[in-house]
Amino acid sequence: MSLKVYNTLTGKKEEFVPIKPGEVKIYTCGVTVYDVNHVGHGRSLIVFDVIRRYLRYLGYNVYFVRNFTDVDDKIINRAKNECLPFTVIADRYIKEYFQDAENFRIEPADVEPRVTTHIPDIIDFIQRLIDKGYAYEVEGDVYFSVRKFKEYGKLSKRSVDELIAGARVEPGEKKRDPLDFALWKASKAGEPAWDSPWGKGRPGWHTECCAMIFKHLGETIDIHGGGLDLTFPHHENELAQAEALSDKPFARYWIHNGLVTVNGQKMSKSLGNYITLKEIYSKYDPDVLRLLVLSVHYRSPLDFSWEKMEETKKAYERLKGAIDEYEILKKLPENPDFDEHLYDEIAKAEQGFYAAMSDDFNTPEALASLFTLVREMNILRDKAVKSGGISKKALESYKEASDVLHSIGKEIFGLFDSLQPCIEVEEIKVEKAEEKIDTQLVEALIEVRNKARKEKQFEIADYIREKLSQLGIVIEDTPVGTKWKKK
């Protein structure tokens, strides 16, 4: 099946066709490293991590670049407040970023460039825009002439007339037109600066990404990604500069993830309503946030709450539990008369999963297919326990279902990093083997009963207690767990 991708540029889903067959070049805007990362940053990281993983699953050779903005007004201001060099602030939060990314199992980008190591590339980029007549210098500042680029506004669907109504010139700016934006800013006392043909200064935010993309990926890339809030002005300004300079399409597909909100308001540091990623993984398995992010379509807003984290934690435990329970089921006695299997359900789940993912990376629908399989696995488990055994075919089908969940979850969704797929291990022969097997069976049934009680499946729990009693086993539920003994 072909992959469909929603393209912000065209406002519709399109068949994904890379520039070069078999290869995909992706750039996403990274963080400005002046503070800790919050759930909003985490969502964007997870979304594009999964997109990258799925493209790779489809057989593409993916080259992924994500930058660091390591010089910026916010970084400079923080450095002044802490009486530290701006580089110390940037290095501190780049280190924190890598810690967060590792904890949430975000795969490192192939290249993670910093602005400060690309100053010559940025200067060259700006000079070429000046040479083509799209930029001009005024007393050490360099601006992009928006009206010169006739297609300005095509990404965000805004007209120049609409934009001019709300535009204004900040005090001290010398630009010719309120719409024009800075490519290079003349230095101010006490701020970092680099030599340039226009005097000492530092680059403007919108230019940095363009220069780094041109250097590492070329003039046209397959996918440019980022948060929805970057569409305008940042990505609009990037597109204008890049296409003005190259006379080529800048990106074939623009993909934007929706924002994270809290009670309907955007999560942000300025509003003080943010939850740090460190707080998340100090309270939860990082997989829980990944699953929460994937439970909402990437283009939709995600309203964060601790209640939703708790709900997602339970869902994650069901998913993980279905994988783990193979180890319990294989300890049940063989029952050839147990005529059940999961092969049809596995095929439906895989088909549904890949159909959803190929429809604009629809992770909620993809997850629904996996949880339908989990439900069928639980049904088979309960029937096997009630029947007192399981057939070889049923057990093998459960193992395959477990492996499918593990493989998809790990390779595409980035889950289950600590779990291992089901591997058959030959039982070690010891003296009194029969007694050992009986003990394993009892403990396996008690574990199934405990799970049933936790899921409020009391009929199953009572049934297991009764069957164990018939086998001469007494179980006792205590505050520290379930104990058992022979009558």
Swiss-Prot record:
Give me the residues that bind Zn(2+), please. Answer: 29, 209, 234, 238
InterPro entries for the chain? Cys-tRNA-ligase, Cys-tRNA-synt_Ia_DALR, Cys-tRNA/MSH_ligase, CysS_C, Rossmann-like_a/b/a_fold, tRNA-synt_1_cat_dom, tRNAsynth_Ia_anticodon-bd
Q: How is the cofactor bound?
A: Binds 1 zinc ion per subunit.
Which cofactor is essential here?
Answer: Zn(2+)
EC no. given is 6.1.1.16
A single Pfam family, by name? DALR_2
**What protein am I looking at?**
Cysteine--tRNA ligase
- What's the source species for this entry? Persephonella marina (strain DSM 14350 / EX-H1)
Which gene holds the coding sequence for this protein?
Answer: cysS
